[in-house]
Every structure is written in C-alpha cells, then in structure tokens.
A protein has these predicted regions:
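A generic structural motif
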Residues: 28-34, 132-133
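Helix-loop-strand module that forms the ligand-binding subsite of alpha/beta enzymes
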Residues: 51-130
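Glycine-rich phosphate/pyrophosphate-binding loop and the adjoining helix
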Residues: 134-208
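N-terminal beta-loop-helix "entrance" segment that forms/cooperates
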Residues: 37-55, 149
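Secondary-structure boundary/capping motif
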Residues: 12-15, 44, 79-80, 114-115
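Short hydrophobic segments within beta-strands
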Residues: 6-8, 36, 106
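N-terminal beta1-alpha1 ligand-phosphate binding loop
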Residues: 1-30
C-alpha cells in the first residue's frame, strides 16, 4: 500500500513531522508512506479559474495515486493550523482528490490532550460536501507530551503508544482495503446504470 502523510503545520520543529517520520520508518515493511510538507503553499485565495498552484497540483496528484492519506495535526486554539485549513480549501475548491479517499487522522501536542480537539474539528471538516473523505471511524491516535516522546534517532519512546499506533495502523490498512473495494464497486455500478437505456430494457422484454 502507498500512503501520503501530510505534515499539518509549517512549524520547522513540529513533533507531528516526527510522528509521521516514525510511522514511515516503523511501518516500512507494511506500507510506503511519503511524508509531504505544506508550509510553502500560498494561502487560499479562491481563484476565479479554479486552478491550483503547482505545488498543490503535485500534492493532489500524489493523493490521487495513493491508497490513502494520513494527516498529522497539532492543535492551535482548539482547532487545526491555518496552513492545514488553507491546503484543504485549495483541494476542495480545485482538484478534489480527497473524495472517497481513506484518511487516517493522528496528532501530537506538547500538552496532555494530544490534539484531540483539533482532530475532532479536522474530521468534521473532511466530511464537508466538497471533500467527502472516507475518514477512519472509531480510532484516533493522540500523542500527548510529544516533546519528550522521541529520542535523538526519532524513535517513539512510549512503548504503550507504539502498541496503540500499531493497532490503529493495522485497522487503517484494513479500512483502506475495504473502502477502496467498496468505492470501486460503487463506481462500476454507477457507470453501468449511466449506460442503461430504456431501449435496452425494451429489448430485454422482447427477448423474454
């Protein structure tokens, strides 16, 4: 499986980047995770031609080609960072690559809550009509006290959190497999229905 990991902040020292980098290395035998930065993208400005900047278009294509997306978000004032919200607005207004795309939400914070309120808000945003992401239900990974969570090699020090992350990622991989198959089947049936004509129905009736 191939996943795109989005660092949901422009902070150069964010532990959310460390979390995704740990996941990339820790799960390398199970899946390929490409960690993507969003800090250099321009702020969303609702262009009249609905054409995304080049960097947004490149990321959008990567999302299209991936089996799923992992977003790691910090929490600023009970919500997600402005740079992450801006990216989502670009995607929803232009290329819409998150439609039917399986998404796993994780997060790290310096405090004890592990970006829980930001994650809840992000899930709500991703369910918007022009996004329609397939968000993994029932599982959330919250890494609190994240400044102390990693060693100098980027390894996650909390063994109970490693176990929890293993379980969440295993569930996500299963969720991705099931979701993508269901979406594929649904799109096939929709296409077949679109091609259906009343003439075909009449011909079928005559043959009967």
């Amino acid at each position: 499986m191939k996943f795109i990991g989005i660092v949901g902040t422009n902070s150069a020292h964010s532990t959310n980047r460390k979390l995704l980098q740990f996941m990339r290395d820790h799960f390398s035998e199970t899946a390929e995770i490409e960690v993507c930065e969003i800090g250099d993208f321009p702020a969303f400005n609702e262009p009249k031609n609905k054409v995304a900047p080049e960097g947004i278009s490149v990321l959008s294509e990567k999302i299209n080609e991936a089996d799923g997306v992992i977003i790691s978000t910090p929490e600023y004032d009970h919500s997600i960072p402005a740079v992450l919200k801006s990216l989502i607005e670009w995607l929803s207004y232009t290329t819409r690559p998150l439609i039917d795309k399986p998404v796993m939400v994780v997060g790290a914070s310096h405090g004890s809550l592990g970006s829980s309120r930001a994650q809840a808000h992000l899930r709500q945003i991703l369910d918007a009509p022009e996004l329609k992401a397939r968000i993994m239900p029932g599982s959330e990974f919250l890494l609190g006290h994240s400044l102390q969570a990693f060693d100098e090699n980027g390894e996650l020090l909390y063994s109970e959190k490693v176990t929890e992350l293993d379980e969440c990622f295993e569930e996500f991989c299963l969720f991705v497999s099931i979701t993508n198959q269901l979406v594929k089947d649904h799109r096939f049936k929709t296409e077949q229905n679109r091609k259906f004509t009343w003439e075909q129905l009449a011909e079928g009736g005559e043959r009967a």
